[in-house]
Amino acid sequence: ADTYAATRYPVILVHGLAGTDKFANVVDYWYGIQSDLQSHGAKVYVANLSGFQSDDGPNGRGEQLLAYVKQVLAATGATKVNLIGHSQGGLTSRYVAAVAPQLVASVTTIGTPHRGSEFADFVQDVLKTDPTGLSSTVIAAFVNVFGTLVSSSHNTDQDALAALRTLTTAQTATYNRNFPSAGLGAPGSCQTGAATETVGGSQHLLYSWGGTAIQPTSTVLGVTGATDTSTGTLDVANVTDPSTLALLATGAVMINRASGQNDGLVSRCSSLFGQVISTSYHWNHLDEINQLLGVRGANAEDPVAVIRTHVNRLKLQGV
């Protein structure tokens, strides 16, 4: 053990859509990440929020995270926290930074759809094509039950349709107006914003990174192909990790909705926030948190090492 990742303030890892701290109380969402950081001296807490819910509103993930932040501060005696959010967890972290700025030292977002996800738009469009409207009700009921089952605390505060709406490009534009951040560039610019923000007299350090394993290939008859640059020929990840091929398929849908390069669910442009560490990691959306179970393509970087290096970066910044 050493003090490489021993930050001044505790670190809170904030999960995304469909997440929990431990799936069914067995498998860590942030696979192998909490224990790695702890072995390098970090105080790390893992939030457990609704897997399917919006970020704002009284039942939202934002208020759940705010309550958890206050618990961590009470338990540790610290005055602030460093928030690290994956996927929707980055939007949730921004909520807390906006409404309780004095409790936050930094916000880091990993594969976060700050501008929404073209795949969420696609799913919403597909559900709209059902004239009965039953499919969205049935799917939502199923997903809500799934969310409760996999949640380590069997959290019943699940609303799949609210979660889907939250992640659309239209709804995130509204969210960004309601919870603005200096870390965001101008809408539609595919640029990031400032590396720091001051909210109510409190300074926040802002960082992001994301995977762009899914890249567009040639266009034939108006349909653009997609390739997964994280995997090699006959890559074991295609066999042992079912999410690998699934996220190539969703990434292809995104590319054909003009997302550009992406991680299967979030485009490079959508992930940009604060100081961008990199957008060239050969990761899909789950590789970013070392899932499934640590399996990744032959070309993929080690996400555990990237997060460890970043927590050391926070330490060197004095937070």
Swiss-Prot record:
Residues binding substrate: 17, 88
Reactions accelerated catalytically: a triacylglycerol + H2O = a diacylglycerol + a fatty acid + H(+)
GO annotation, cellular component aspect: extracellular region
GO biological process terms on file: lipid catabolic process
Keyword Hydrolase: yes
Cofactor needs: Ca(2+)
Start and end residues of each AB hydrolase-1 domain: 10-288
Location of the active site: 87 (nucleophile), 263 (charge relay system), 285 (charge relay system)
Function: Catalyzes the hydrolysis of triacylglycerol.
Official protein name in the record: Triacylglycerol lipase
Gene that this polypeptide is encoded by: lip
